[in-house]
Structure formats: structure tokens, C-alpha cells
Amino acid sequence: MKIYGKNVALEALKGNKKIHKIYLSNKFKDEEILSLIERKKISTKLLDNRELDKMCKGLHQGIILEVEDIKTYSFDEIIPNITTEYPLIVILDHLEDPHNLGAIVRSSEAFGVDAIIIPNDRSVQITSTVVKTSVGTIEKVKIVNVPNINNAIRKLKDLGYWIVGTDMEGTNYTEIDYKTKIGLVIGNEGKGISKVTADNCDYIAKIPMKGTVNSLNASVACGIFLSEINRSRGI
């Protein structure tokens, strides 16, 4: 896959990611990145910005990397083997916007989420836009692909997890006890959590709001919940 942008490039170059080739603007000047490229002896090709623009739709900042695909995992590879005291899993109910997924990945890395579960079908998957929006943090978060999120939720419950769904109606999110194994469900941008998924949740929680807006962007809501979970756990 192709990833782009200075921060993403820096994360990839500092890590162990296999980089096949780098396309650079002939005006690229970032000395730290250039030094890492030279040190790692990675094949590069100089192009003008118009050629780089044709290669990607986003803001590339003069650098595009051709890399191996981001690794994803199955449920059984990751979830049963989590050893943190209070595991925290984010479950995405058919999100569609790659910017939302990237922002959720970034927040998840910041707040110490153990894994993110996304369904295989009818859901955004990992793209160059997701990687760019996550500012490279996607390499530090376990992404778990599942055929069916409700089957995954039932398996989480069998492992002792409490499932918290997010919605405009429900218990105040500050009143829930998060000092246990938690699976946090974030709904689709337009439809929210499906009825079947909501029925599988132990709690439905809301973020109280005072303004005229009655809902938040999925990634914003996720960040607020993750912050509250950490606060309630004394982190």
C-alpha cells in the first residue's frame, strides 16, 4: 500500500516497517527524514509535485512511501491473550469514514486501548487515508478483523467483558463503573449502533450536551469516552 505525509513517513522510518520504495518531491528538504532514508538505504525516486499529486489524493507533503500492508489480526490471535489489568477494546459498528477510523486509532493509541475490532464487510478498512489521519499510530494499535461484530461481542462477554454502547439516549457516561474488562461500541456515523448490537450491550451510555447539537462525530465521542474511562480508572 502507499502511505504519505511527513509524520507518517517518520513513524515508518523509525520503526521496523518494510518499505519497498519512497517517492520524494525534488524540493523535499526534511533533513531528519532524508538522513533516515540514506541510513536505511531505501530505494527512492525524485518526482515533481504534480506527479506526486497524481499518485495520491491527500496532502502528501512531498513524500509517498510504498510499504507492506498494515497487519491485522483475528479475534483469537489477540483478544484472549490480553494481559492488562483492565482490558479496553473499541468495537466499531460499521463505520464508513476513513478519517473517523484514523482519528479513533490515534485516540486509542493515546489512551492505551488494547485492540480495535472492525467488521470485515460494510465497514471502512485500513487505507492510506486512515494511516495518514492516525499520524502513523496505526502501527502501534492492534486491529482485529471479525466476520460479525455481534458474534465478537458474545465472545467478549464469555471472556468477562462488559459491553458499553454509545448513544444519545442512555445512562450518563460518567456513572458507569469502568474498573473491569470493557468493550466500547462506537456506532455508524449516520445510523449509530444497530438495534441488534444495542441489544447485546450491557449498558447504553450517553454524553450529556447542553447545546442545540444532539450528536457528536464518532471519533470525537470515542475520544471523550476513552478519556473518561482512563480518568475513572485513575490514569
Predicted regions span which residues?
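Structured adenosyl-cofactor binding patch, chiefly the S-adenosyl-L-methionine
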Residues: 10, 15-16, 132-135, 198-235
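Short, glycine/polar-rich helix-capping loops at beta-to-alpha or helix-loop-helix junctions
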Residues: 29, 123-129, 191-197
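Active-site/ligand-binding-proximal alpha/beta "capping" segment
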Residues: 164-217
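RNA substrate-binding interface of SAM-dependent RNA methyltransferases
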Residues: 42, 82-171
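A short acidic, often aromatic-flanked loop/helix-cap motif at beta-alpha or helix-coil junctions
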Residues: 50-55, 72-73, 149-153, 171-173, ...
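N-terminal positively charged helical leader segments and presequences
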Residues: 1-80
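Short beta->alpha connector loops at strand-helix junctions that form conserved
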Residues: 48, 93, 119-120, 141, ...
